[in-house]
Amino acid sequence: MAYSYEQLEQWDKQYVWHPFTQMKQYAKERPLIIERGQGSYLYDVDGNRYLDGYASLWVNVHGHNDPELNAALREQLEKIAHSTLLGSANVPSILLAKRLLEYWPHMSKVFYSDTGAAAVEIALKIAYQYWKNIDPVQYAKKNKFVSLKEAYHGDTVGAVSVGGMETFHRIFAPLLFERIEVPSPYVYRMDEYGSEQEIVGYCLRELERVLEEQHDQIAAVVIEPLVQGAAGIIVHPRGFLKGVERLCRRYGVLFICDEVAVGFGRAGTMFACEQEEVKPDLVCLGKGITGGYLPLAATLVTEEIYAAFLGDVDEDKTFYHGHTYTGNQLTCSVALKNIELIEKRGLIDSVKRKARRLAEWLERLYEIPIVGDIRQKGLMCGIEIVKDRRTKEVFPRAAMVEHRIILEARRRGLVIRPLGPVLTFIPVLSMSEDEMAEAVRILFDSLACLYEQARAELL
């Protein structure tokens, strides 16, 4: 049965509460209602097409409606859709775990979940219980976690506890466990600390100071390797990630790497940790794991950590955590095919090549005076919008400049999203160079249009 746009708009606004959305503002606007996708494009119910410039929230790898991923899903659906992993196993989850660990040979076990936030939540709980399982007396105080300024690791209570984004997390402060914040190398806004490497040195010294003083109370350090995504695509200079790992080893705290956003080719390698030869104790995977098809996440751990949970039943060393759809056959089957296609299609080399071209095209955006900084790692791009380049002052939130830019881009055929004052361009990984060039052209024209409006209204 076909429904008119007007009917769908009415029901959407009447019945659906959208995530991370101020619904009062949403109700005033004409919503984008997607009906289908093909390749790098999304199509709305009226047949208009849009380049998917945010990879449907950073998840899409091979494009929409990929025939091989579709076939893998159908093949599994003909066998079974779901059976529990609590006390029993299934074929796709076994094969996927084996496949993932081929990329992480120092790891030994895979614990499945369904969202990146859940993968982080699991990592935090494992890290906490690990110390208690080893020696609850000696490690009784190892209850704290360290994370970066402006950290974002998801929106469950544990993940929010290690988050540092004031806008998102402030209201929930009374619900959260204790977190220690350390500075992040946000180069664009840390001029006073000197060069990139001087900024890295400062941040690592601050982390070492915390670890030196409180290592006996800290269970783990958790970071997004190389790029803080939701913070506005803050790209860490080379050496920071490796430096954090060294400090964790020196002071005897666990190291958790949240690869949810940066993994599966997004940052230019299959996994971000490869770029600095880092071997964390726990790794969180999600987003691109199924190529953008279905919700799946995983937490990988070393044998040393896993072994701490082994014991007799009455020792209570069991990890009492699990989700209803943990290790679901449909999700694991499509994830297996996704990894196979990443390799077969040479996707990682393609991402590296396209990232170099994209960096060249993005430079033109600096011609627009409200573009303060452009940050990129692989196919993750952040364009920071400022009112004044000299002072780096941003526009007032109430002016909604960034929101107006994305609406203008949508009108021209590109879907993107802002993160505070930062426009993010996170394309489908398989997007062609011609399509990316078109996306950047739309970005330029949209920015130019809003600059003229802002100059008249706000500058």
PLM segments and residue spans:
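Conserved N-terminal phosphate-binding loop of PLP-dependent enzymes in the Aspartate aminotransferase
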Residues: 1-459
